[in-house]
Amino acid sequence: MDSSPAFPTPHDACILACRKCIVACESVLNTVGSSFPPQWAQAVNLCTASIRSCEVAVEELTLASSVAAQTCALCAVLCRACADECAQLPGPWTWVSAACQHAAKECHTVALTPARVN
């Protein structure tokens, strides 16, 4: 009998959502390059911040770090801001918005989850 949970743990769901957010943000940033309309500047900056915070969140969760919840709390704030900003833009930005919104939700869940006892 398989003893693994039927559903991913909040930590695993957060890692997966963060990885998808990283892919979405990197994809759109590679598409727009360095020449983009001025009204996209905030979205570009928030995508960059989301990538960094998601990378750190994934690393801290993977290491079962004692600061994983705090890292995820910050990641949730940045990803939510990115999602809100990207939702106002056309085309591929809507995909980014959805990915960041999902990462924000999963990170928020981890931030509110009691720490694992190893």
List each language-model region with its residue ranges.
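Amphipathic alpha-helical hairpins
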Residues: M1-N118
